[in-house]
Amino acid sequence: MAANKTLPTYFCRNCENPLALGEDLISKKFVGASGPAFMFSHAMNVVVGPKIGRKLITGSYVVADVMCSKCGETLGWKYVETFDLKQRYKEGMFVIEKLKLTKRY
């Protein structure tokens, strides 16, 4: 019988503000400005900045920077709109850089 492993909660590395739940983790295969990044379907305790056009590895998007609501640290971005139908699944998702996170079980 497999052990029942609980999912982690992800926190801002700078101020310990809770940002995302393990059940909302979609992928660990993203790349941010500082290296590896995680995609989440939902994020909490964040401030979403203004929409901007940005060219990323997989194409052009409308994104918004995402900051911690407690300390103001820039964490990553939110996909607002894509122009490629194959990438449409990303719309509304949050990408947070691994170096900006800590996790606890």
From Swiss-Prot:
It holds the Pfam family Yippee-Mis18. GO terms for molecular function: metal ion binding. GO terms for cellular component: plasma membrane. Zn(2+) binds at C12, C15, C68, C71. It comes from the Eukaryota. Keywords: Metal-binding, Zinc. Transmembrane segments: none annotated. Residues 8-105 form the Yippee domain. Belongs to the yippee family. This is Protein yippee-like At4g27740. It comes from Arabidopsis thaliana (Mouse-ear cress).
